[in-house]
Structure formats: C-alpha cells, structure tokens
C-alpha cells in the first residue's frame, strides 16, 4: 500500500529555494557583464564583427 512521503521542513525548503535564486542571480550577472564588455569593445573572450 502506498504511503505519503514526509513533509519537507520549511527551513529546508527555503534553503533550496534561496540556492536556486542565487544561482540565477549569478548567471544573470555574468550575462550582463559579458554584454557590457561586448558593447564597449573591451571583451577579450568573445569575438564579434562590428
């Protein structure tokens, strides 16, 4: 017979949620930084024709 799983604690849920949000924040920051360097022409790792 199937038994329902135990409920995840609120603190554990918040830790996982914050980790997920922080990862998204750093990814967005990197993307913005790359866009800025491409726009100003100071990029050393990304080549594009102007």
UniProtKB/Swiss-Prot annotation:
List this protein's GO terms for biological process.
translation
GO MF terms on file?
A: structural constituent of ribosome
| Keywords, ordered alphabetically | Chloroplast, Plastid, Ribonucleoprotein, Ribosomal protein
Name the predominant localization: plastid
Q: Where in the cell is it found?
A: Plastid, Chloroplast
Please give an example of a GO cellular component term from this record.
chloroplast
Cysteine pairings via disulfide bonds:
none
**Does this UniProt record's set of keywords contain Cell membrane?**
no
UniProt entry tagged with the keyword Hydrolase: no
- InterPro entries noted in UniProt: Ribosomal_bL32 (IPR002677), Ribosomal_bL32_plant/cyanobact (IPR044958)
The family classification in the record reads: Belongs to the bacterial ribosomal protein bL32 family.
Please report the name of this protein according to its UniProt entry: Large ribosomal subunit protein bL32c
Q: Which organism is it from?
A: Lotus japonicus (Lotus corniculatus var. japonicus)
**Organism lineage:** Eukaryota, Viridiplantae, Streptophyta, Embryophyta, Tracheophyta
């Amino acid at each position: 017979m199937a038994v329902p799983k135990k409920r995840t604690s609120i603190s554990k849920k918040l830790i996982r949620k914050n980790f997920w949000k922080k990862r998204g924040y750093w990814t967005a920051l990197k993307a913005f930084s790359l866009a800025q360097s491409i726009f100003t022409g100071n990029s050393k790792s990304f080549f594009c024709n102007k």
